[in-house]
A protein has these predicted regions:
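Surface-exposed repetitive/solenoidal architectures
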Residues: 1-279, 369-371
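Extracellular modular ligand-binding repeats in secreted and cell-surface proteins
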Residues: 277-369
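Core hydrophobic alpha-helical transmembrane segments of single-pass membrane proteins
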Residues: 391-402
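Juxtamembrane cytosolic interface motif at the C-terminal end of transmembrane helices
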Residues: 400-411
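Cytoplasmic C-terminal tails of single-pass
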Residues: 411-423
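Extracellular Ser/Thr-rich, low-complexity/disordered mucin-like segments
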Residues: 369-393
């Protein structure tokens, strides 16, 4: 995706994108990104952002923190209408980090009208502050009209650190307004420090850290469904885990319209890392749902031992476009920076594709093929005509020679007969 090379600007996604086989580097961004209702399929993130952002824990201690997600660090950005299906964000680090499907970190940024489905976010960390979120990780701004269905996993690898760990179905920690969001969360948290988990938010706190200001936030008309399974291996126990907010550090917000079907599931066997697979040796069978003109295809994996199920490997249905027209001219390099558009005869959607100026399109390839075929035909015809002409000339020459010989023989015969009569 060429746009990811820019740190700012205004962009609109014009088609669904299957990112199978692409190891995505989180995009640090400060512009406007309009997903236009289109989807990113099979996003895979295994590295953190290039930039860091300052974060704070509940004790107001500061950390330079990395982000991981489709976006790494959003700064004064606006993201709308972006859907994410079948993403796997799997980070292992020793640095402070927050991971989430849309953005790991958000500074005064707005995210709205997005759908996140069948997405897995796992963060294995030994740092002092870290966490996972179902939309964003840590920050400030607004979350509006978002539906997310996520599996979140936090694994603490250093029992001596006594970390500050955060997990939330909407976001892990910070001060983002949350309005009209629907959260489905399946969370797993293995921690040896201080747990801050919530179906909606892990820790709702003052951010940015300007204590002279009064922040009036909004947490309105949200619903949460699911469960967080966790342990807190710490004698100085906190074990914050609630359906809405694990811990609240700032009460200056409007709160109403919250509904939940949520279970807090605390365990006490600290030797077993908590994961979605409830058995030690999962064995999966696969069921493939084919894509249609209206819906994506996907593969559902079911463990025959413990019954755990998840879906991934999303596919886009094949479009049938008879004619494409140029929307953006290519620059004349090998790079595919031109755009063509056509209408699918199966689903009536507008379909876009990239092309390079010096590479002919399928239609042109067909035309070129026809031209080549015509050329070969003409060449073959010309060669055949030449051969025929030669044959005709040879035959005529043979006939002429034959006639000449016959005439000569007749002359000789007549002379011979005259000589015989004289005798």
């Amino acid at each position: 995706m060429e746009a990811a090379k820019s740190a700012s600007g205004n962009y609109k996604l014009m088609t669904d994108i299957d990112m199978t086989g692409v190891e995505w580097t989180p995009w640090d961004f400060s512009g406007t990104f309009d997903g236009n209702g289109h989807s990113i399929l099979n996003l895979s993130v295994k590295t953190v952002s290039k930039k860091t952002m300052k974060t704070y824990d509940g004790n107001r201690k500061e950390y330079e923190t990395y982000g991981a997600g489709f976006f790494g660090v959003l700064t004064g950005a606006k993201v709308t209408g972006l859907n994410i299906y079948g993403a796997r964000i799997e980070i292992s680090t020793t640095e402070p980090c927050f991971a989430a499907p849309i953005a790991g970190l958000a500074d005064d940024s707005d995210i709205s009208d997005c759908i996140i489905k069948d997405t897995y976010v796992s963060l294995t960390d030994s740092a002092k502050m870290w966490g996972t979120g179902g939309i964003a990780g840590f920050g400030s701004g607004n979350l509006d009209n978002i539906t997310t269905d996520v599996t979140l996993v936090c694994v603490d690898t250093d029992a001596a650190v006594r970390d500050e760990q955060f997990m939330g179905g909407a976001y892990a920690a910070g001060f983002l307004n949350i309005r009209n969001c629907s959260i489905t969360i399946d969370g797993y948290d293995s921690d040896h420090g201080y747990v801050h988990d919530g179906g909606l938010v892990g820790m709702y706190m003052v951010y940015p850290l300007e204590l002279s200001k009064t922040y009036q936030g909004e947490v309105l008309n949200n619903k949460v469904k699911g469960m967080i399974t966790f342990f807190e291996d710490n004698t100085d126990r906190r074990a914050y885990c609630q359906a809405n907010m694990g811990e609240v550090m700032n009460w200056t917000y409007a709160y109403s319209g919250f509904t939940s079907d949520f279970k807090r599931n605390e365990t006490y066997d600290y030797s077993v890392t908590l994961l979605p697979e409830m058995c030690s040796n999962p064995s999966y069978s696969d069921t493939v749902t084919e894509a249609t003109a209206a819906d994506f295809g996907y593969t559902t994996h079911t463990c025959s031992t413990c019954g755990y199920m998840y879906s991934d490997k999303y596919t886009i249905h094949e479009h049938k476009v008879d004619n494409y027209s140029v929307v953006k001219e290519a620059t004349g390099t090998d790079k595919k920076d031109g755009i063509e558009a056509g209408t699918c005869s199966l689903c009536n959607q507008t379909v876009y594709r990239e092309y390079a100026a010096n590479v002919v399109t399928d239609d042109n390839e067909q035309t070129a093929g026809n031209k080549a075929s015509d050329s070969q035909s003409k060449k073959g015809l010309s060669e055949s005509t030449a051969v025929f002409t030669i044959i005709v000339v040879v035959i005529i020459a043979i006939i002429i020679i034959t006639v000449v010989i016959m005439v000569q023989n007749n002359k000789k015969k007549r002379r011979h007969n005259r000589q015989r009569r004289r005798r």
